Amino acid sequence: MDSTMTNYMGQENLPPALKLINDKSYQYSTHKHNIETSNDGTLHSYTIVLSREPLESPTSYNKYQKNVEPVQKENQKPKDLNKMTAGPHIAVKNSSGLVSQISSTTSSERKRRTLARPSSSSESDLKVGNIQQSNQYFTLPSVMKPSALSTEDPKKVIVQSNTSSSSMSDASSKKSLPTYTYLSGHTTGSARYVTMVNVKFLLLHCDVLQRRAQSMFTDEFPSDCRLEEVVINFHQLCCRQLLDQNFNPRLSYCIGELNYSDSKPVSANDMSKTLAQLATTQSIAQLSIIVDVTEKNMKLK
């Protein structure tokens, strides 16, 4: 291996990359060029040492290289970084103000970064006050009788629905329910939960050949949605099956899965009740509604 070393004064002889140094106090440099030849080819290694003061004899340079070489070998083994301890071979006294391209790993770099675990949301954050109300039912007409369809402006209907829902009494229910509905644009601040109820809507009707048929619709509604609004929403979906018939059905419902034997008839007072009031529980998950508009229960126009 051939090696040459040359001392320079000034920054004119520095490589272009080192000329970008803004500190003009480094006016002394030592350039060492190593040439190593093997069967694979020739390897050229360049080492430049900068200093603010004149460098001493070449022996001091060789001593500095001897001190930093173990550090360079340690840096080539990333697995041993955590086992490195401060020793004589790492701490190099820079009494002459030398700056080298070879640097040892600092203690801060050897520390492992700990990832902060994401904070999991608790159930207390799922209160109604923090839930954004859905607008998917805002266009539903709000009427007192299910047989009459509203043609009013949706904006006016929303205002009327908010007014009527806020004045609804809770005396018919043993449990205290919130005074707002899913149509409200704001919350009352009460710490109550609103669950989504899976509603199955079974329509019994007659086809064009006057044969008895049935159609099934499924949707989800908040537990504080009134039964009347649920029926009106489904009525808009089943207009094709009704043809030109008046919608004067016989209604019945059952909590949970669809069961004809366990179904209960719907009275006029039940139409103004919410799904939670109808099931007498806030934890209602499924409701089935049977709507019979067959020939015995319908009136042709």
From Swiss-Prot:
Q: Known InterPro entries for this protein? A: DUF508 (IPR007465)
Compositional bias of kind Polar residues: 93-102
- Quote any Pfam family the record assigns: DUF508
Q: What is this protein called?
A: Uncharacterized protein C38C10.3
**Where do Low complexity bias regions lie?**
161-173
Where is this chain compositionally biased, Basic and acidic residues type? 71-82
Region Disordered, residue ranges: 56-126, 149-173
Top-rank taxon of the source lineage equals: Eukaryota
